Amino acid sequence: FTLCSGELLKIYYSDEKSKSSFWEMFSGEESIEEGQIYISEKLYKVSNMSQAVREGVGFITEAPYRSMILDNMSATENVSVPLHEKVRGFWFAKKYTRSVSDFLQNDELNKKKLKNIGNAELQKLAYEKWLVYQPKIVIIENPFTDMDINMREITRKMIGALQKRGIGVILLTANFAIMNKIKGESMFLKHGVLTREEEW
């Protein structure tokens, strides 16, 4: 498949093993047995997630407000985590962390301990990591599993914000109903084989 800047691709997977293999091919945890991946016309070959991030791929796990936020760090520090892979000496230059704080535009949020912040704000922070970093692609695992309507709407808006920044978005979902609720090309992943909608 081809994914252009700002486009969204929805992939419905029918088995957990296929989803894990797809994710791990991009994160470097699993080698590619057939075919090749190119990002911006450059062969994509990585051996770990840190290298994947440096090569322009971001990752958002299921329920990121629980799994991707470090409550012993400030909001600015959380959003800045991927940037230290991109900018040498990031943590030692105040101008960099200040620019992230300016991006967040929420001094009150940065003063609070993250354990005292609601899930909706934490969800936004998890996505804002990649808005600041601006990778070429972000792969999102089951973005709409939360049953809370407000949380789903925030997630939808944050995915749209990624697209507006020119970031390609790949959604991996086990919820077939989601396929018709968000715009974008659809593909299906079953037993390790990726097919287009008309071939399903």
Segments (PLM) and residue ranges:
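Glycine-rich phosphate-binding loops of nucleotide-dependent enzymes
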Residues: 1-200
